[in-house]
Amino acid sequence: MKVLVYFQPSPKHDYFEGARMRKTIKGALEVINTAYTSNILDDYDVAHFMSPDDENKLNIVLERKIPVVVSALFGEADPSTRFLNYKSKDGKRITTIKPKALRMLNKADLILVPCKTGKEFLIANGVNKPIEVCVPGVNLSRFNFSREDEKELFYRYFREDKNKKLVVALGEYAYNLEGIHAVINAAVKRPEVTFYYVGDESFALTNRRSKKIIKNSPKNMHFIGIPTDDIYRSMLLNADVFMLPGYNYSGFISIEEAMASNCQLIVRKTAVCPEMFKNEKNAYIAEFSETLTSLCLDYLDEKIKPTIDEAYRKISLYSLENFGNELLNNYKALIARK
């Protein structure tokens, strides 16, 4: 068995959830001694794609009569691996599949999603190919808290005070930074705490409304693009709180990494898979920005109990070896059907 693991965006986009998912898949295959390649011209038994931008490459593989697998809904915070669109109609928020993503998914032989609700959503929105739930694995050794050299990277790079608590929020630099005030209001009320908002900032650079919000934020609230993998991991290892303030479904793989880093999760209800989390057990989940702000403040003030241990136990179930075996079983079943 040899697998094509394909995700090759432009270098400026090869650093976020898509790149980390590619590394995770390759790592899982290595653990179970399964060969892989990144060269589409090689010989292989099955091809695994993860970006709706790669439809042309998928077509090349299909012409060779090779089975195709597509991973979807694992990296929705990354523009390169985003399958969903959002719009408002009559005051209601509507989630749809990108037209090119839907077209690509319906060319695949098998689609892998991280949760049951994701599978149900794809089916309800026009995907007619087989879909399996396959939760991405996590290399827990990459989040080893005893590695002080990696923890130091964040402080050396951003020159922050080690004695201050750190809150990291992941989101999008969309039109008006929807949901961002859940974080900003917490930063206003806790000037002694350092806050970082992380996301793909290309849109914000040209958007006046986003730039105004950023400009008027308190000094302890920092807005950055996606840092390199080692620095981002160092941020997580030092973070007291990991927030998802946005309304959009967020990046599943980023949530897994926050769980593996022993961050306290404080997330918006619409941003996460409901079957993965239980409020007050392995995360704090809220629908409204005011509640998210209050939860963040209460946690920083030690008024509510951490759910970190239960979150870590949950993510520990999804090892690279388990993920690799699940991938291999799906590949073999697909080849047998073909």
Where are these regions (language model features)?
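Nucleotide-activated donor-binding/catalytic signature segment of Leloir-type glycosyltransferases, i.e.
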Residues: R208-P227
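A short, active-site helix/loop in glycosyltransferases that binds the activated sugar's phosphate group
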Residues: M104-P130, V138-R142, G179
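Conserved acidic donor-binding segment of nucleotide-sugar-dependent glycosyltransferases
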Residues: N279-E290, L297-I304
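Glycosyltransferase donor-sugar binding loop
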Residues: L170, T194-R209, G225
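Aromatic "clamp/platform" in nucleotide-sugar-dependent glycosyltransferases that forms part
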Residues: Y247
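Conserved donor-binding/catalytic core segment of Leloir-type glycosyltransferases
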Residues: E160-E178, I184-A187
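Membrane-proximal helix-turn-helix segments that form the acceptor-binding/catalytic region
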Residues: E76, G91-I111
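Short hydrophobic beta-strand element within catalytic cores of glycosyltransferases
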Residues: Q264-V267
